[in-house]
Every structure is written in structure tokens, then in C-alpha cells.
């Protein structure tokens, strides 16, 4: 399972969880799976795809301000644990943990 967190100081502000084999959109629109209501974030900014193998890919959805991985603008990229995904002025830090199907998990923002 992948976790994306925005941080304010040392405290997480938003946390998103992605289970294996899912596709989620991130943006400021209500129809986005993960809503980030911040300046410079497009309505549908990027798509996150978790493969059944555990790999996480990001694809920019023609956002106005671009999608960045570790400071580099990307159209598509494979993400790794510890990477920073930037949408608008929001940085999301990525973490990966093995998925335990017996554990209760939440998808979406908290």
C-alpha cells in the first residue's frame, strides 16, 4: 500500500492511501478521487496508478502548472518510496508498506 502525505512542519495535513491495482485522480475538483484544494492545483491534475506488482506510476493530466517528481517536471514517471510529488505548491511525500489484506484501511483523504 502506498501513502502520500502533505506535511506542515512535522505534522501530516493530508494523507492519501492507494491500494494495489487502483487508479486515482488527484486535483481540486469535487470529482477527483483525492482532493487537494490549493492554489495552482488543476481541477484534475494527475492520475496515480498502482500496479498489482506494487509499482506506483503518475501521469500529468495536462495540468496548467505541471506535475513534479523530486523537483523535475514529468509527463509520466514511476514513483519510489521517499520521492516527493509536487502538484501546484503542494508537496506529497511517498511511502510504501506491504499491503495486509486483513488490516482495515481507508482510501482517500483524511
PLM regions: where:
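Regulatory inter-domain linker segments that are low-complexity and enriched
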Residues: 1-4, 89-110
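Short polybasic amphipathic segments
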Residues: 2-7, 65-67
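Phosphate-binding glycine-rich loops and adjacent basic patches that engage nucleotide phosphates
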Residues: 5-11, 43-44
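Residue-level signal for short segments within beta-strands and strand-turn junctions
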Residues: 6-8, 50, 96
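Solvent-exposed strand-loop boundary residues in beta-sheet-rich modules
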Residues: 8-10, 64, 98
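Forkhead-associated
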Residues: 14-89
Amino acid at each position: 500500500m502506498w501513502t502520500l502525505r502533505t506535511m506542515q512542519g512535522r505534522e501530516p495535513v493530508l494523507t492519501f492511501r492507494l491500494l494495489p491495482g487502483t487508479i486515482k485522480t488527484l486535483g481540486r475538483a469535487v470529482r477527483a478521487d483525492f482532493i487537494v484544494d490549493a492554489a495552482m492545483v488543476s481541477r484534475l491534475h494527475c492520475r496515480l496508478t498502482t500496479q498489482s506488482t506494487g509499482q506506483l506510476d503518475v501521469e500529468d493530466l495536462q495540468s496548467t502548472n505541471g506535475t513534479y517528481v523530486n523537483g523535475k517536471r514529468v509527463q509520466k514517471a514511476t514513483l519510489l518510496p521517499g520521492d516527493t510529488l509536487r502538484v501546484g505548491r503542494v508537496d506529497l511525500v511517498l511511502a510504501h508498506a506491504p499491503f495486509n489484506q486483513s488490516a482495515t484501511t481507508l482510501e482517500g483523504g483524511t
